[in-house]
Amino acid sequence: MNKLIELLPSIKAVGFDLDDTLWDNRQTIIDAVNAQNEALVKQGLEQEHIAVVYKEHLDKTVSQEPELQSDVSALRLRVLESIANEHGWEASIAGNIYQAFYEARQNVLVYDDAIELLNHLKKDFQLAVISNGNVDVKQVGIDHYFDLVYRAGPDGIAKPHQDMFVKAHDAFNINDDEFLYVGDHIVNDAQAAMDAGSYAILINEEDIDLGPRCLRYKTLSDFKADVLRYLKF
């Protein structure tokens, strides 16, 4: 019997990573950084110097406030505030520059397979988001699929820490091994879920065996196909 079909009867809730799991995040990040940099250029920074300036202020901020590494939004805003302060800009400018980044960051294209998968899973399982990113699922238009949404920073410590997984187990009132987590990253998603006592689905083309508690699929489409087989089983 298919391993997923054997596993799913014991699962009560399914969690999802977002970036590079439910959509391709690469171009979105490029576009968001470009939007941020265009806003910085308008304030007088030279395009060719922005990467170095940003890195310097990022390193300084992380050194002074390492806890911000669990909140990508707060960290980016603090870095922009540091740049603004160094250049004597008005306090509101950093927020405006961050907003340019954030708005572009929400322009993701959810995979058709992801929508179909969520539609089917929603009928039989509680669903969750556990993400280190700052995409707002409401703005993206998929919030209605999820019973809870946890984002690192506002809702807990960033993956691979177990914090948000444990909170999800508690919120759903389920045992650790009744939770299945789907993500693309070997450490932050698959290993993190297993460390929290749960099962993992790794969406990754790399041929890697993480043990019996992790099932690997090359694509989300492949995973969806097995889910549909289970639901029709």
Where are these regions (language model features)?
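Asp-based, Mg2+/Mn2+-dependent phosphohydrolase catalytic module
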Residues: 1-14, 26, 43-48, 90-92, ...
